[in-house]
Amino acid sequence: PRSIPTPSTPAPPSTADQTFDAIARLVEGLRGLKATGPYTRALMTQAELRAYQKKKFEENYTPEEARRDTLTLAAFDLLPRDFPLRDFLLDLYTEQIAGFYDPDTKQFFVISDRTAPGILERVTFAHEYTHLLQDQHFDLVALGFTDDERKRPKDLSDDAMLARRALVEGDATLTQLLYLSRLPPAERRQWWEAVQSQPSPVFDRAPRVIREELTFPYDQGFAFVQHLFEEGGWEAVNAAFRDPPASTEQIMHPEKYRLHEAPIRVSLPPLTDTLGSGWHMADENVLGEFFLKVYLEERLATDQAERAAAGWGGDRYAVYVNEGAGQDLLVLWLAWDNADEAAEFVEAYRAYAAKRYGHGPAREAPGQATWVGTDVLRLEWQDAHVLLLRGPNEALLQRVRARIPFPR
């Protein structure tokens, strides 16, 4: 393991500003980065946070976008179609966020209903100050962390963006833990007890997919950054900001990042004309290894889901909906590292489908299986490719299938 730089610990400060200044100097020493410009910081109450988040939601996450996200997650059996996603996320972020840095405004806030920073606020400041250092040295906006779509990298998939978030949060979490390690044992215990005693009723009742997506950048991101740090110190972590991970697969398997195992590009044809009147596309993107695992975990044990998702090479999904008829279509095209990995996924997905429908396939042929219930699921595989189609009836799936030829 790499040795950690040990900056001198400042004398106990007497005001909130002095406290934060002292933490900033300590974090700069621990992280090996110095602030290069001015910034704004402030304490914000829970009530102010909710007002701020509500304004951000209204500006950047419309009811239409939330509805599309809900329908997409519903197509993967991860949310009910009528789940109030937008309102729930506002409640969740208000409850969960202890502080945040805004790369667009270069401001960061620590959430507290007190004027003097306690142990939670001090540790949160260390985490958020790391984000400021990241932004000043590596430009978080250029990496995609912005509400301005014009400034985001083009063609950056949701999976790649989640991988970048894991890098950013993993780095800040490692730095936060290094800061904690410099505190007296009594203060570390005080912090842990404060964290454990924080009520989280909204998080506790959140659908599993939301909990998993919220924690992935911190848990898996920390493991990824820790791996980089142990291999090459802060130089390796800094290099990852200049050459960010391309997929959640690279986060979950750091050796694939080191080998630059890039995702296989997969494309799908437009299907609106094929589907006919009343249908529109809700979403098209890359699912990625992480969300593929989350999807499988709805009906499979975690270890089986992890094994089935490992070996992911690339994918593309599309969700189309006919809201008037209450119908949806899921298309998921998966490319695997090799035929054996594809076969392992097929075996696991057959078990998933059997649990979803309560029975085995209605029809089978070499390289394909079809389940029939209140909707129809068609699974096809050939070499290292797997195609999954689920929709309201077989006739529609047949038309869609005719538009998606297997690679030769």
Regions of interest found by a model, annotated:
Residues 18-117:
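Auxiliary, metal-adjacent structural segments of Zn-dependent hydrolase domains
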Residues 27, 123-140, 169-173, 225, ...:
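Active-site recognition of the HExxH zinc-binding catalytic motif
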Residues 36-56, 146-156, 191-201, 243-246:
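Acidic helix-start/capping segments at beta-turn-to-alpha-helix junctions
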Residues 108-126, 160-164:
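Short pre-active-site segment immediately N-terminal to the catalytic Zn-binding motif
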Residues 135-192:
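Post-HExxH zinc-binding segment in Zn-dependent metallohydrolases
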Residues 167, 174-202, 229-243:
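Short helix/loop segments within enzyme catalytic domains
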Residues 200-333, 341:
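Pan-zinc metallopeptidase signature
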Residues 313-408:
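C-terminal soluble interaction/assembly domains
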